[in-house]
Amino acid sequence: MRLASTSLPLIVSYLLSGAASAAPPAAVVLFDDTPRPDVAILALAPDTTHRLDGEKVTADAALRTTFPDSAIELARSMQPDGGAALTLQWRQIWKSGVALQTAPQDLRPFLARGTLAFDLKVDALDAGGLMVKVGCGPSCERQVPYVLPGRAAQGKGWQRVVLALSCFAREGDDFSQVTRPFALEGTGSGQVSIANVAIAAGGTPNTACADWRTVAVTPAKLDEAWSIDWWLPRHRQKLGEARQMVRKARSPQLVFIGDSITQGWEKEGAPVWQTHYAKFDALDLGFGGDRTENVLWRLQNGAVDGLDPKVAVLMIGTNNTGLRGDFPASTVAGIRRNLDEIKQRLPRTRILLVAIFPRDATPESPLRRINEAINAQLPALADGNRVVFLDVNGAFLTPDGTLSKTIMPDLLHPNEAGYAIWAKAMQPELDRLMALPRL
C-alpha cells in the first residue's frame, strides 16, 4: 500500500513536457458552500444518472422494474456548522453514487503532487461498501476501494479524506479533459454524506491506495463489501474440508483453483462434477470475486497445505479485468506468481492452466479483448510437462465468436450446460495428465 505513487511513467513524461512548466492552479473546487452552476451534481444508479437540481432526487422509478426492492436517494443537507453537504442513501443495490460532473478539466498539472480531498460522514455502512472514483479520459475511470476505512468511520462524525491524485493514474491515461473528476459510489446498503470536495495542487494524503503495478502479485484477502461476511469463513471451511478428506484417506487427487466460475462447480455445475470428478475425490477451491492476489493469499495461508493431488486446474484473472481493469501484463504477472506458489507447495503436482473464459456477447467487447490479450501470453508460462496450457474457449462460442446466454446466462458464468461443455472439452487433456506417472 502507498500514500502516494512515485515515478509513474505518465507523470514523468508529463513533467518533462513543456506543458508542465507552468505551475498548476491552487485547486479545483468541485463542491462547497458556494453555488457552482458549472458543476452538475448527479445521483448514480446501475444504468442511469439523475441530476440533482432541487433539494433531492431519487432513482427509484428507474430501479422499479429491474430492482424492485432497491432505492437510491441523493439530497442536499448541512454540516453542523451550517456548511453545505450532500447525503446519499441507498438500499440493496450493487451500484449507487454521487458524482460531480464538469466541463472538461485538465488535471495533468495535479498528478505529480496533487490530492483529492473531501469531508465524509458515514452514518450506515454495515451492509455496504464505498469506492472513490476519478475520470481518466474518454470511457476511462480509476477507483480506490474504501470499504474497510468506510466501515471504520461509521458513526464517528465528519472526517477529512485526502487521497493522492496519483492513486487514480496509470500509464497511458489521459487526464487532459476529465469531465467527472469525482464520484463516490456505494454498494449494498448505506448512508453517507460528503462536503468540501476539491482537487488541490498539494496536500498530505491520509488514505492509502494500492500500487496498480504490484497489486495483482501482492497477497490480499478479498475485502469487498459483498465478500467480507463469507470469504474468510469459506477459506477456513475449505481448510477443514481438505483436512477431513486426508484423515479419511480420501486425499484429493484433483484440485480446482479459481474464482466464481470454479466455485460454480458446487452449484450449477454440481451434476457434471459428480459425473466427471467425484471419482478423483476432487476438491473445489473456487471463490467468487477472487483476483490473482486473493488466490495467492489463500495459497500462502494453507489452501493446499498437506495435499498431494495429481493435477491442479487453475483458471484465474477475469475479475482482474472486470472488477479493476488491470492491464493484461499485470494479470499475467499475477497468474505467474500463483503458478510459482502452487509449484512450491505441491511439488509432485502437474498444473493444468486453463485460458480465461470468454465473457460478454461479442468479440468486440473490451473486457473480452483484455482477457484474450491475457490468454495470448499464457502459453509462455507452460513447459508442457509440469505446467500445461489448455484453451477450451472455442467450445463456448459460435463460429462468429458470439457467446450465447443458453450456456452462460449472464455472459460470464456457465450454467449446467456450460459446465458440461467445459468438462467435455477439458477431458482428453485432463485424463492424459491424471494417467501420467508422478513427478
Predicted regions, residues:
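Extracellular ligand-binding interfaces
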Residues: 90-171, 188-193, 198
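Bacterial N-terminal signal peptides
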Residues: 7-18
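Short carbohydrate-recognition loop motifs
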Residues: 70-97
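Oxyanion-hole/transition-state-stabilizing segment in secreted/luminal serine hydrolases
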Residues: 263-278, 292-336, 341, 352, ...
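Short beta-strand-plus-loop segments that form exposed binding edges in beta-rich domains
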Residues: 182-188
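Extracellular carbohydrate-recognition regions
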Residues: 23-69, 206-212
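Catalytic His-Asp segment of secreted/periplasmic serine-dependent ester chemistry enzymes
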Residues: 358-439
